[in-house]
Regions:
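A cytosolic small-molecule/anion-sensing beta-strand core signal
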Residues: 29, 57-58, 74-75
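Short acidic/polar mixed-charge low-complexity motifs
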Residues: 31-32, 40, 61, 69, ...
Length: 124
């Protein structure tokens, strides 16, 4: 049986400095629980088969949508983006601590491959 223990999420954020590079904390029901530090602009993308959940632990995350709408996600808030909706996460220059729940097959850049794409995620 797997060891059952609590995870200090803020402590996990202290273990890495890379931005836009998700790290895996655990898995459940075919999904990964990931943490990621975000800063400045990410790529426009969508996820054809998966909804995406953003949960902000520190800072303020901005999510732009193609209809010119921007949603602000503050500390302690979540935002769920339905599959197929094109979006671009960004910050106003601050480092934002974010938690994600996504199917194991989800690529963080969705339908776009760029220099920001990370295919082999590290466990922390």
């Amino acid at each position: 049986m797997k060891k059952i223990e609590s995870i200090n999420i803020m402590k996990k954020f202290s273990l890495f400095n890379e931005e836009w590079t998700p790290k895996i904390l655990g898995e459940l029901n075919g999904q990964y629980v990931k943490v990621c530090k975000l800063k400045d602009d990410f790529v426009w993308h969508s996820h054809e088969n998966e909804d995406e959940l953003f949960m902000v632990f520190k800072g303020t995350l901005l999510i732009d949508f193609r209809d010119k709408k921007t949603v602000k996600v503050k500390e302690g808030e979540i935002l769920i983006i339905p599959k197929g909706v094109e979006h671009r996460p960004r910050t106003n220059g601050e480092v934002v601590f974010n938690l994600l729940f996504e199917p194991k097959t989800t690529l963080h850049t969705g339908n776009i491959e760029s220099e920001m794409t990370v295919k082999d995620l590290d466990w922390i």
